[in-house]
Amino acid sequence: MILTRIILHNYRNIEAAELCPEENFNLLCGDNAQGKTNTLEAIYLLGHFKSFRRGRNEELIGSADRHTRVQGEFLRDGLRETVSITITGDKKNIEINGKRPRQSNEMFGRFPSVLFAPEEVSLPKGFPAGRRALLDRALCQTRPSFLDHARAYQRCLRQRNILLKSGAAAPIVLPWTEELIQTGAMVRLARRRYLDRLLPLLRDIYREICSGRESVNLVYPSESDNLSDLKEELRSNLEREQSRETKYGMTMVGPHRDDPVFMVDDRVLGLYGSQGQQRSFILAFKTAQIIDLEKETGYTPLLLLDDMTSELDRKRQDYFFRFLHQRQGQVFITCTELSPLQNAGFNRMRTFRVREGKLCDYQ
């Protein structure tokens, strides 16, 4: 699968742009704050239907118009497919091949992409929500139905929290507790099964990056892959926290509070790991995600690498560049200088100059 064309209208600082990328390596080069990451974000939007940055949809709209539009054309299984996303205010309209998709599985995982962004390096030391999001984004692309389970859980969670905050009687809260147990167990089961697949890859890749000197693990709070056991576990946890939930007016346990812990040599990476270990872990996770995605779906995802050379030292760059050269697939890389990539052997690539929101072939 490759992206053959992308058209942007009034997207952040990009008033109008059209790119026809190469099927292998594409470089977006320019100074900071010129529009490189915005372009990468627009490509990401075509596959994930939301930005990888925090914020509201309205923030994607530039100043030249009241709406923004991103259109992509893909070659998939020998057939051309189009994706169009229009955002007006807080409303988003998505069309695939000219039609609005009716279900999540018609959208997610159809045009897969994997992002490597500088801010992800801090995830091991950050809040649990960031690590959950990293895991869930990867999971959605191999199991689009996971999004339906996650949304059902969030809807139930919001309603249950409203009742708890209002001091509703236990019989009124009980049906929502039962629904929370059902949907929450499904979310935990999907995460557990994904990690069971990913962990062997993650460990092997990390071992290769660090020349076998260290071992890694990713510990998820729920270890069972049995749905009935997960339901009983969550039920027991909720019963234990009942008094605290009444006191604070919110749901105190569940998938929304789970913390996937990143470990190196049986030590919590967020507490004891070095910056280099954090970078190696995220690099290994992303590489494992790519390999797993290809195995599970049969499609090679687009790789979106945002200023990767600034976050990886020479050794880690060399490892990942070797990985990129060995695989077949489309890659988009942002950078401020060409020389590090040219020195790594990226001589056959299409280079675009990005300056003040305008994109053109590099001269």
From Swiss-Prot:
Main location: cytoplasm
KW Kinase (keyword) present: no
Any Pfam family the entry gives: SMC_N
Transmembrane domains' residue ranges: none
GO BP annotations, alphabetical order: DNA replication; DNA synthesis involved in DNA repair; double-strand break repair; SOS response
Binding site for ATP: 30-37
GO cellular component, one term: cytoplasm
Protein localization: Cytoplasm
Gene Ontology terms for molecular function: ATP binding; single-stranded DNA binding
InterPro entries: DNA-binding_RecF (IPR001238), P-loop_NTPase (IPR027417), RecF/RecN/SMC_N (IPR003395), RecF_2 (IPR042174)
Function: The RecF protein is involved in DNA metabolism; it is required for DNA replication and normal SOS inducibility. RecF binds preferentially to single-stranded, linear DNA. It also seems to bind ATP.
UniProt cross-references to NCBIfam families, sorted A to Z: recf (TIGR00611)
Protein name: DNA replication and repair protein RecF
